[in-house]
Design a protein with these regions (language model features):
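Core catalytic alpha/beta fold that binds nucleotide/phospho-ligands
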Residues: 1-102
C-alpha cells in the first residue's frame, strides 16, 4: 500500500470524448484532435480529478495537458493547481489506462 494518493481512469477509445471535447479541452488545443487523442486527454483529466478527491474543477482551465505523441504506453505531463504531474498511460486493446501517483 502506498502512502501517496492515486488517481486512475480507464476509458474505451470512442467518438464520444471527441464530440464533447469543448467541455474539457481549450479551443486552441482542438487542432488535429482525433478520437484517440481526445479520449487520452479525457482520461488524464479524469485521473487528476480522482487524485484531487474534491469537486469544483474546471476541466478546460484548471488542468493543462502538455503536448504529446500517442504510443502504446508512455508519460504525459500536466499542470494542476500550479503543480506539475506526470501521468502514466497504456493503451490496452481499445482502451486507455491512465494513472497519477503523487
Amino acid at each position: 500500500i502506498s502512502n501517496k494518493r492515486v488517481g486512475i481512469d480507464i476509458e474505451e477509445i470512442s467518438k464520444k470524448p471527441l464530440k464533447l471535447s469543448s467541455k474539457f479541452i481549450s479551443k486552441e488545443n482542438h487542432l488535429n484532435l482525433t478520437k484517440e487523442k481526445a479520449t487520452l486527454i479525457w482520461c488524464c483529466k479524469e485521473a487528476i480529478f480522482k487524485w484531487h478527491q474534491r469537486g469544483n474543477i474546471n476541466f478546460v482551465n484548471d488542468i493543462k495537458i502538455s503536448s504529446f505523441f500517442i504510443q502504446k504506453k508512455g508519460k504525459i505531463l500536466a499542470e494542476f493547481n500550479k503543480s506539475n504531474y506526470t501521468l502514466h498511460y497504456q493503451k490496452i486493446n481499445t482502451h486507455f489506462l491512465v494513472y497519477v501517483c503523487k
